[in-house]
């Protein structure tokens, strides 16, 4: 009940017990507001009703300085965050408070972060390709407009760099709105991303940052904030979708959302499930993922980085995410070790829309032929390791040579990685990607050594580099 006042009776880490009059017990997910003695405001979200007017709530910020006996006020509604055009070009925390030092948000509309997904009759399910400008993704595992894509990989194989490149490409090439949720990742990376977005420009007047909303709940924050920051970003993205826009939602990293849920679950005293995860893992994931959908008004296309603990894809966290996705981009450490970036594994990455009826016969044929050549090369690895390449048949030698060129041609200079590669980023349209790989498979560039294919845009760039070296 709004305005009801209770007393904090227990503080266990970030979990707070508060006692209210029994007939005024706050509802589940209601926000409680607690004023600390130092003048700071602390918000906690009700998670359990224990009976007798006692509720258990999880704090969204540190409980340092809190003591038993302080007042807790029921706001009568869930955490509500600002939405609308005023949020563009701003940086927020889980409560929707700006953390960029740019003053208050210019908006009058606030929405609760707990909302039901759109009704089934309002949802739209058109299968349409979403161009990213990244060759290996567009060819092998094309994104679905209004779909969900997971970028899977262990530590340090390049998930965040791909996400950053996608944000830059979308803002420049498609002039869409982006919402970025930094869930439990490094504050330094978040800071770098903000500065890069401010420097990157769509044109002389517009920065990439001006078309982006950023919401952060970083590694150093309590689990409650990391668990709810995804919902805060989702609520802001839903506003733009409901206004008829196509929105991109980036979540880095969805595994940290699961990890935060596991911490909260343990603090609330729930019995852990397999590998120590929370028993409500599937439900929590579903509540977030089902809201990421397209309606007849607009679309939300989502890209989610998924950390894979110890490179184990059978771990319950990545396995639960898999079931919600339309496309999966798998990053492989062995490819990164060869210096090929993005380190996407074209044999393990999949997309629901790699179908001749959607992408076209030519695209489908080229993608499958590329995978066939790479698979044959993989099958021959043991023979090459034991006997050497010279013992292969002429046909297999040609397959190996083309496969090694394909592997290197899948690498690409990124705009956001210019300081590492020393090369300007390249955006390759999907039509050019398909034609380039078709020409490579047809043997047009069999005479060019494989090193010329590394970190190039289209096939014409490869030919130019080769001819320049011969002068």
From Swiss-Prot:
PROSITE patterns with a match to the protein in the record: ATPASE_ALPHA_BETA
Claim: Protein biosynthesis is one of the keywords in the record: no
Pfam family membership, one: ATP-synt_VA_C
Domain of life, source organism: Bacteria
Subcellular location: Cell membrane
Quaternary context: F-type ATPases have 2 components, CF(1) - the catalytic core - and CF(0) - the membrane proton channel. CF(1) has five subunits: alpha(3), beta(3), gamma(1), delta(1), epsilon(1). CF(0) has four main subunits: a(1), b(1), b'(1) and c(9-12).
Family stated for the protein in its record: Belongs to the ATPase alpha/beta chains family.
Protein name according to UniProt: ATP synthase subunit beta
Source lineage: Bacteria, Bacillati, Chloroflexota, Chloroflexia, Chloroflexales
């Amino acid at each position: 009940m709004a305005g009801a006042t209770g007393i904090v009776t227990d503080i266990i880490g970030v979990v707070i017990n508060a006692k209210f009059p029994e007939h005024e017990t706050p509802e589940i997910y209601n926000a409680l507001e607690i004023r600390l003695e130092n003048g700071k405001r602390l918000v906690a979200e009700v998670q359990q009703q224990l009976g007798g007017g006692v509720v258990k709530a999880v704090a969204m910020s540190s409980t340092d300085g809190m003591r038993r006996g302080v007042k807790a006020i029921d706001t009568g509604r869930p955490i509500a965050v600002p939405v609308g055009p005023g949020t563009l070009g701003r940086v927020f925390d889980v409560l929707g408070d700006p953390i960029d030092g740019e003053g208050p948000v210019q908006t009058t509309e606030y929405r609760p972060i707990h909302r039901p997904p759109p009704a089934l009759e309002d949802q739209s399910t058109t299968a349409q390709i979403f161009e990213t400008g990244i060759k290996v993704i567009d060819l092998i595992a094309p994104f679905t407009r209004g779909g969900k894509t997971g970028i899977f990989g262990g530590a340090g194989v390049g998930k965040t760099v791909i996400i950053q490149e996608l944000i830059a490409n979308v803002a420049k090439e498609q002039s869409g709105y982006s919402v970025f949720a930094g869930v439990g990742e490094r504050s330094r990376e978040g800071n770098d991303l903000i500065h890069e977005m401010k420097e990157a420009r769509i044109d002389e007047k517009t920065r990439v940052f001006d078309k982006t909303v950023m919401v952060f709940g970083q590694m150093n924050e309590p689990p409650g904030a990391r668990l709810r920051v995804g919902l805060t970003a989702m609520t802001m993205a839903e506003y733009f979708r409901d206004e008829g826009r196509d929105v991109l939602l980036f979540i880095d990293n969805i595994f940290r959302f699961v990890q935060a849920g596991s911490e909260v679950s343990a603090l609330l005293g729930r019995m852990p499930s397999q590998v120590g995860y929370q028993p409500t893992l599937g439900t929590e994931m579903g509540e977030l993922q089902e809201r990421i959908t397209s309606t007849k008004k607009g679309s939300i296309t989502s890209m989610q980085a998924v950390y894979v603990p110890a490179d184990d894809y059978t771990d319950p966290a990545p396995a639960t995410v898999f079931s919600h996705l339309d496309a999966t981009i798998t990053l492989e450490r062995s490819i990164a070790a060869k210096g090929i970036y993005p380190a996407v594994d074209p044999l393990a990455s999949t997309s629901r829309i790699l179908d001749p009826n959607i992408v076209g016969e030519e695209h489908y044929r080229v993608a499958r032929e590329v995978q066939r050549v790479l698979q044959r090369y993989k099958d021959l690895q043991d023979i090459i390791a034991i006997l050497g390449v010279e013992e292969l048949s002429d046909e297999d030698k040609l397959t190996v040579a083309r496969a090694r060129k394909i592997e290197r041609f899948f690498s690409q200079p990124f705009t956001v990685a210019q300081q590492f590669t020393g090369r300007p980023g390249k955006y390759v349209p999907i039509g050019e990607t398909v034609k380039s790989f078709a020409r490579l498979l047809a043997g047009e560039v069999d005479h060019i050594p494989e090193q010329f294919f590394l970190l190039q845009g289209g096939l014409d760039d490869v030919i130019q580099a080769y001819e320049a070296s011969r002068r």
